[in-house]
Swiss-Prot record:
NCBIfam families: cinA_nterm, molyb_syn, PncC_domain. SMART domains: MoCF_biosynth. This is CinA-like protein. Belongs to the CinA family. It comes from the Bacteria. Pfam families: CinA, MoCF_biosynth.
């Protein structure tokens, strides 16, 4: 089955808006064993839209088109699909009634331009939209079918889940089995090299392997087609987990902050944070997780040396002897946070995020991290590359990963 994506809108081509819909759908289709063959971006121009619809539907069995479904002058999708088919637009009364009721709830009358959202090419199947005002629609075009959806992400994704993905699954019949593991701080090339014995195994003929690097994560993914796919995918999973061991921090939809919160909650324990160069990023990552209040005791941004001494009890002589960016100070920050918060765990981070402040002995990107727990304190040193934001974010995620490992 050949699938293409056609994303429309001037805003996507001027850089005002980043298309997040297409990567999301590509990932969901990959779970079904399908790789999108092409993605096309096209402006709100009638000639360009008609040409793009003709081109994509001549190649693909399914074209998922987004944008241009609203009430304004530059919303042209229904009009252009109808022009390609050589059919008129027709008013869809059930959609008109839904729009009237929606506007009534907001105390407004339905205006003529909003009625535009309920006009579709003759013969189209209308896809109701529970998340917004503009329905989607689908109609046969060319060698296959085009599905036209609003571009608002929550609406696009909802309609994909309700119509596009079930339609694709029904066309495919037996859905392939897929697996995904997430590695922490493993370069993509290293992951590929380590996976060679699995990929070259004749038992895995026909399996599609893929990698995605999004520092500090690298994702290893596999899709297994055909009979016995689930059992084959499970065997691959066991081999992958054996290869990477503790470098695997999660699978599927797992996210590192959520895993850390879940592990702390399962143990009935809390953590306290003593951050310097990260400026509260670790606390931000944790508090973004629902339920974090049950496991996060306190977060201190002790940026100045005086604050390190006064708030977290870092000894002045330690700072004088080793400097703020050092392993002893990272340990003292972790232990001070743990002590101050009365928590089971403490995390300490200190470093030079740049762009200035580095020395030959401690260049920009030098970061010391520590985790203090019931059995003592573990510390690591890292030399990160990148700009100030990248260094700080790497350090924040590294701190969470160290805590994850300590909680195993």
């Amino acid at each position: 089955m050949q699938v293409e994506i056609l994303a429309t809108g001037d805003e996507l081509l001027t850089g005002q808006v980043v298309d997040t819909n297409s990567p999301w759908l590509m990932d969901r289709l990959w779970d079904l064993g399908l790789m999108v063959r092409r993605k096309t971006l096209v402006a709100d121009d009638r000639d360009d839209l008609r040409a793009s619809i003709l081109e994509t539907t001549a190649r693909a069995d399914l074209v998922v088109m987004s944008g241009g479904m609203g009430p304004t002058e530059d919303d042209l999708t229904s009009e252009c699909v109808a022009a390609v088919l050589g059919v008129p637009l027709e008013r869809h009364e059930p959609s008109i009634e839904v729009l009237r009721e929606r506007f009534r709830k907001f105390g407004r009358a339905l205006t003529p331009n909003n009625e535009k959202q309920a006009w579709f090419p003759r013969g189209a199947e209308v896809i109701p939209n529970r998340w917004g005002s503009a329905p989607g629609f689908t109609v046969p075009v060319g060698r296959g079918r085009v599905v036209c959806l609003p571009g608002v992400p929550v609406e696009y994704r909802g309609l994909c889940e309700e119509w596009v993905l079930p339609h694709v699954g029904a066309r495919l019949g037996e859905v392939p089995a897929a697996g995904l593991v997430k590695l922490f701080a493993v370069p993509e090339s290293h992951a590929d090299h380590a996976m060679r014995p699995v990929m070259d195994d004749p038992a895995n003929a026909g399996v599609r392997f893929g990698y995605r690097a999004h520092w500090p994560e690298t994702h290893v993914k596999w899709t297994v087609p055909g009979p016995g796919a689930a059992a084959r995918a499970a065997r691959i999973r066991e081999r992958v987990l054996g290869i990477f061991g503790e470098q695997v921090f999660g699978e599927g939809k797992d996210e590192l902050p959520e895993l850390v919160v879940a592990r702390l909650a399962a143990r009935g324990e809390r953590v306290a944070l003593g951050e310097s160069c990260t400026g509260g990023m670790v606390a931000e990552l944790l508090t973004a997780v629902p339920g974090a209040s049950a496991v996060l005791d306190l977060g201190v941004v002790a940026y100045a040396n005086a604050a390190k001494e006064r708030v977290l009890g870092v000894p002045a002589e330690l700072l004088a002897a080793h400097g703020a960016v050092s392993e002893p100070v990272a340990r003292a920050l972790a232990e001070g946070a743990r002590r101050t918060g009365g928590a089971a765990w403490g995390v300490g981070i200190t470093g030079i995020a740049g762009p200035s402040g580095g020395t030959p002995e401690k260049p920009v990107g030098t970061v010391h991290l520590a985790v203090a727990g019931p059995s003592g304190t573990e510390a690591v040193a890292r030399a990160y590359r990148g700009d100030r934001d990248r260094v700080r974010r790497q350090a924040a995620y590294e701190a969470l990963n160290l805590l994850r490992l300590a909680l195993r």
